Amino acid sequence: MSRLRLATAAAALLAANAASAAPVSYGIDPTHTFARFSYNHLGLSTQLSRFDKTTGTVVFDKAAKTGSVEVTIDTTSVNTGSTVFNEHIQGPDFLDTAKFPTATFKSTAVKFEGDKPVAIDGNLTLKGVTKPVTLKVTNFTN
């Protein structure tokens, strides 16, 4: 009987370890997550801007060193700090938000150092054009 209890306890511990090593899914919190970008303005300054509406999911499996990221950005929510620049960037010369109200990113690979993600390869679709990009992970806390 004690061997059965030991086997049951061992199975429970293995199951607990397997559960803790399972992939972890994160929903992007749109009140605290902003896609940011910067651009050079006439060679005089670098403007830091953001999109105020971002949704998506992030999944990481640290044990398997895999993951996935899917993000949708509402391009009409661009925020440069200037209403005039916002309208200009939303226009047909740049984002053309009337025709393309969203941009998307879908990962193809996640690179890890130890148990932390450091880079995410994927495809960015902007104005109906998809191109490969690599996003650098600068901070990850679990």
Role assignments for model-derived ranges:
Residues 1-8:
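Bacterial N-terminal signal peptides that target proteins for export
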